[in-house]
Amino acid sequence: MAPKAVLVGPPGAGKSTIGRRLAQALDLPLFDTDVAVEEEAGRTIAEIFVQEGEPAFRALEEEIVRKAIESHEGIVSLGGGSILSERTRELLKGHTVIYLEISVAEGLKRTGTNTARPLLAGGDPRQKYTELMRKRRPLYRQVASIRIRTDGRSPARVVQQLVAKLAE
């Protein structure tokens, strides 16, 4: 068993929204790893970060991603930082991985000052998002077999393009 596609990208790129719509368009189930992490922990991601720290969160996330990649047959939406794990990047090899690309400006517009996103909380949001992208963009590109920009595009348009690409 393997997922039809795995979505990756930074906060605000549309992984959850596009994931839901893509799964619906393809009549497949969606597995959102952020939702699964929260269900497994019984807490929000922000609470895990505060109470246990990022390393504990990443360990739990890595295990949930592994299970999803190994057993889910639909669409898998990964948390934005999941690609920081070398183990996760290895697991993604050979799978259809869709990188939802977004500019820093658009990402900031979409995420705003969302405190549910612990890595963007506090300080200068533009600086934090820019630094996050500097570190992660090469990793997203490394794992991606399909790249699609989501800036200025409706979710419906992005899904339409992805359905066509997945049919190729």
From Swiss-Prot:
A biological-process GO annotation: amino acid biosynthetic process
InterPro entries: P-loop_NTPase, Shikimate/glucono_kinase, Shikimate_kinase/TSH1, Shikimate_kinase_CS
SUPFAM superfamilies in the record: P-loop containing nucleoside triphosphate hydrolases (SSF52540)
Binding site for ATP: G12, A13, G14, K15, S16, T17, R117, R153
Cofactor binding, per record: Binds 1 Mg(2+) ion per subunit.
Coiled coil region boundaries: none
Molecular functions per Gene Ontology: ATP binding; magnesium ion binding; shikimate kinase activity
Record Gene3D superfamilies: P-loop containing nucleotide triphosphate hydrolases
Binding site for Mg(2+): S16
Binding sites annotated in the UniProt record for substrate: D34, R58, G80, R136
UniProtKB keywords: Amino-acid biosynthesis, Aromatic amino acid biosynthesis, ATP-binding, Cytoplasm, Kinase, Magnesium, Metal-binding, Nucleotide-binding, Transferase
EC number, UniProt record: 2.7.1.71
Subcellular location(s) of the protein: Cytoplasm
Metabolic or biological pathway: Metabolic intermediate biosynthesis; chorismate biosynthesis; chorismate from D-erythrose 4-phosphate and phosphoenolpyruvate: step 5/7
GO cellular component, one term: cytosol
Keyword Repressor: no
Catalysis performed (reactions): shikimate + ATP = 3-phosphoshikimate + ADP + H(+)
Cofactor(s) required for function per UniProt: Mg(2+)
Family the UniProt entry places it in: Belongs to the shikimate kinase family.
Subunit architecture: Monomer.
Entry function: Catalyzes the specific phosphorylation of the 3-hydroxyl group of shikimic acid using ATP as a cosubstrate.
Identification of the protein by name: Shikimate kinase
Annotated source species: Rhodococcus jostii (strain RHA1)
